[in-house]
Amino acid sequence: MLIFPLINDTSRKIIHIDMDAFFAAVEERDNPKLKGKPLVIGADPRQTGGRGVVSTANYLAREFGIHSAMSSKEAYERCPQAIFIRGNHTKYRQIGLQVREIFRRYTDLVEPMSIDEAYLDVTENKLNIKSAVKIAKLIQRDIWEEFHLTCSAGVSYNKFLAKLASDYDKPHGLTVILPQDAEGFLATLPIEKFYGVGKKSVEKLHALHIFTGKDVQQVPEMTLIDLFGRFGFDLYRKARGISNSPVKNDRIRKSIGSERTYGKLLYNDEDIKLELSKTARRVADSLKKHGRKGKIVVIKVRYSDFSTLTKRKTLDVPTQDFEVIERSAHRIFDHLTENNSGVRLLGVTVTALEDSTREELSLTADDFKT
């Protein structure tokens, strides 16, 4: 007997993106000498008297059983040849936020779970792409081309299944769980692999001879509720692929921007300014489309060595005028420290946004005339 009806919305298109060994991958990218070696992000126990914990480890180190939250001492005992790096969390956060902006090219319904993973609802999306799988592939492509980092993607009709799918084929995998396949997929899954089922719950379930999703599917709903309360209620539904929690995006949009990665590096200032102008045009058009204007213009320049500079200019009054944004972007670029490396990415963003219907006068190109 069902306590509540099993309402299952299978019409949604949800993607879960999980960066692959994110911190370690960034360090390998920035220091090629680390590639092909077991790498641990965490304090070196030989320098701390055995204190410290592992933040993450690359896949080579994981083959030795090293994982997040393990003591650095145990990690060293498992793999004495591992390289330990304390890591640069400011750098990881900056890159993670930049990756998040890639997600928002496709949808504003982005729910970050941490700096290196997020849910995206692409049921309706900015590019009107019908296939969630195609969007997932495009995101993987964008992240690789712009950051030389990989991610794994899971695609399904709810967050629970998308999360399981992204973990199924790592690194750089893409797994899809269709509605008709969900119960069969879950039936074979060990209960400890169910996202949201903690260690203590696993122990209780094992004590009841419940080891897989199939075992859960065979237990009556009321029995699970009697044994586990609300957790049992949720588990009964999850084992059947039912989870209707929305992708929550409480973020108030504070900026509108556009950026592009170039397959051929830009070296000439004239070429760079031409591309900045094109980008400024896209931003101005987007501001007008959304009825917004902003007071701060920001440009982003990423060079061939992956170093990134962001500089801003604060205007006297808010604007959505293309020529103002273009002129500001050019002036910011003119004041950047000279860098002989080629430019691989350019971005222009207008921030400190407000409603463009407000009565204050907006800045126009005439304000630049002398």
UniProtKB/Swiss-Prot annotation:
Keyword check for Lyase: no
Superkingdom to which the source organism belongs: Bacteria
InterPro entries, per the entry: DNA/RNA_pol_sf, DNA_pol_Y-fam_lit_finger_sf, DNA_pol_Y-fam_little_finger, DNA_polymerase-Y, DNApol_IV, PolY_HhH_motif, Rev_trsase/Diguanyl_cyclase, UmuC
Gene Ontology terms, MF aspect: damaged DNA binding; DNA-directed DNA polymerase activity; magnesium ion binding
Top enzyme class: transferase
Its EC number(s): 2.7.7.7
Cofactor(s) the protein needs: Mg(2+)
Main location: cytoplasm
Subcellular location as annotated: Cytoplasm
Site feature (Substrate discrimination) residues: 23
Record keywords: Cytoplasm, DNA damage, DNA repair, DNA replication, DNA-binding, DNA-directed DNA polymerase, Magnesium, Metal-binding, Mutator protein, Nucleotidyltransferase, Transferase
One GO process term, biological-process aspect: DNA-templated DNA replication
Coiled-coil spans in chain: none
Quaternary organization: Monomer.
Family: Belongs to the DNA polymerase type-Y family.
Functional note: Poorly processive, error-prone DNA polymerase involved in untargeted mutagenesis. Copies undamaged DNA at stalled replication forks, which arise in vivo from mismatched or misaligned primer ends. These misaligned primers can be extended by PolIV. Exhibits no 3'-5' exonuclease (proofreading) activity. May be involved in translesional synthesis, in conjunction with the beta clamp from PolIII.
NCBIfam families per record: PRK02406.1 (NF002677)
Protein name per Swiss-Prot or TrEMBL: DNA polymerase IV
Species in which this protein is naturally found: Streptococcus mutans serotype c (strain ATCC 700610 / UA159)
Lineage, highest ranks first: Bacteria, Bacillati, Bacillota, Bacilli, Lactobacillales
Record gene name: dinB
